[in-house]
């Protein structure tokens, strides 16, 4: 079973508070938590836990937990974070450049096996983009 929960992170009186994400507006920080539970009688082998980056948001890279996540810009090819790409500089040389977190579209963890009756939880925070809000806390 896979359970995805989305909340909003707000600061009240200097303390972080997690609340329902009924409405999210530009600048808000969303917390997404995905829990994988093995309800079968056998071990799930080679689990791949995936958490898509919600549309109109940017991943807050330091919030990824556990920190062993891989990321993707297309949801198909995953690599260790931070993602890098090769680009041509003004003088024609090929240089390696960090991919901005705004380009990340999906996260994936490879925790190995998940025993019967056990659960694993993965999470990350995302900032709602300033150009378009995610209405009602739902991704587009």
Predicted region positions:
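Exported/extracytosolic protein signature
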Residues: 1-140
């Amino acid at each position: 079973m896979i359970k995805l929960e989305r909340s909003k992170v707000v600061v009240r009186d200097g303390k972080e508070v997690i609340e329902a994400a009924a409405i999210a507006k530009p600048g808000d920080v969303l917390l997404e938590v995905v829990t994988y539970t093995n309800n079968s009688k056998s071990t799930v082998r080679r689990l791949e836990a995936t958490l898509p980056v919600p549309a109109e948001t940017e991943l807050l890279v330091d919030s990824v937990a556990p920190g062993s996540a891989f990321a993707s810009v297309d949801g198909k090819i995953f690599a260790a974070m931070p993602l890098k790409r090769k680009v041509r500089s003004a003088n024609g040389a090929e240089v390696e450049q960090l991919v901005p977190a705004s380009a990340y579209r999906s996260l994936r963890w490879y925790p190995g096996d998940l025993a019967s009756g056990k659960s694993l939880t993965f999470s990350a925070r995302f900032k709602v983009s300033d150009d378009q809000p995610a209405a009602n806390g739902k991704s587009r």
